[in-house]
């Protein structure tokens, strides 16, 4: 199945004259396979599809996305397209306050400006006035030919106001951030519910900007997901052990 998907991706890329290098890898799990491959090929970004929730206890993002965000400093883009990319008419971007202080701030702007140029569509940014100033300044300096629009989004809690701005043929991009980063806000925890309820029929992309320091610089095959996550397994194991001991 994975081989067929790679072949299909190569065919699609070839039809658009895009160079695509396919890689088949055997590893302990999907997360460690992606991380080791990214390190070997010196990747700067990771793009994955949005997880398809299979049951009621399954999380919105799935374990793959969650593990990647915990164990790599690279930019991670999570996408779900409900129609071919080449028919998208506009890119709507919601940006949280203080995003301009993130290490990967200019990288995701660069990605969106280039995508806008390839699709021939406008990029409309919604952000705090101060953040909008940094976005506008960078684009005017580096991508002045990009068709853009800017609107103020004073409070990130007003994100749902954009439901009336995102149409079926738009790509809705939400710039988020990892827990503990400069622009992180507790309201990000509501994103899965908001996307599922209000943007379920839209093409959506979540961007997690790259971080300066790698949380798992010493990644190894012996500990592919990092020390931080293993702590949670240890705590869970100790709790189960104590519970059984108490009730035995």
Predicted regions mapped to residue ranges:
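Short beta-strand elements in bilobed, periplasmic/extracellular small-molecule ligand-binding domains
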Residues: 14-24, 122-123, 148-150
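Charged docking surfaces used in two-component/phosphorelay signaling
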Residues: 25-32
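Short, conserved catalytic or adaptor-binding loops enriched in Gly and charged residues
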Residues: 11-15, 139-144
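Juxtamembrane segments of multi-pass membrane proteins
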Residues: 1-3
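Intrinsically disordered or low-complexity boundary/linker segments at protein termini
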Residues: 44-45, 50-137, 143-154, 167-171, ...
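Catalytic cores of nucleotide-enabled group-transfer and carboxylate-activating enzymes in metabolic
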Residues: 7, 11-13, 40-45
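Short amphipathic alpha-helix with an adjacent loop that forms part of the alpha/beta core around
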Residues: 35-38, 159-167
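Well-ordered alpha-helical segments embedded in enzymatic catalytic cores
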Residues: 8, 33, 107-111, 158
């Amino acid at each position: 199945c994975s081989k067929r998907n790679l072949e299909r991706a190569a065919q699609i890329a070839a039809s658009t004259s895009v160079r695509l290098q396919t890689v088949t890898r055997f590893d302990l799990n999907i997360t460690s396979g992606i991380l080791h491959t990214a390190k070997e090929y010196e990747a700067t970004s990771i793009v994955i599809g949005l997880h398809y929730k299979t049951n009621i206890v399954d999380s919105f993002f799935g374990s793959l996305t969650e593990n990647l965000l915990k164990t790599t400093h690279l930019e991670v883009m999570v996408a779900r397209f409900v129609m071919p990319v080449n028919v998208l008419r506009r890119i709507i971007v919601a940006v949280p306050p203080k995003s301009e202080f993130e290490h990967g701030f200019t990288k995701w702007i660069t990605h969106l400006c280039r995508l806008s140029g390839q699709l021939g569509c406008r990029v409309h940014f919604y952000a705090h006035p101060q953040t909008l100033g940094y976005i506008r300044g960078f684009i005017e300096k580096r991508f002045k030919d990009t068709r853009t629009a800017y609107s103020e989004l004073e409070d990130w809690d007003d994100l749902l106001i954009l439901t009336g701005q995102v149409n079926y043929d738009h790509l809705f991009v939400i710039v988020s951030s990892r827990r503990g980063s400069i622009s992180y806000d507790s309201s990000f925890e509501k994103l899965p519910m908001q996307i599922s309820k209000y943007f379920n029929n839209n093409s959506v992309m979540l961007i997690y900007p790259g971080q300066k320091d790698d949380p798992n610089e010493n990644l190894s095959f012996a500990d592919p997901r990092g020390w931080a996550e293993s702590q949670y397994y240890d705590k869970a194991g100790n709790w189960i052990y104590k519970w059984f001991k108490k009730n035995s």
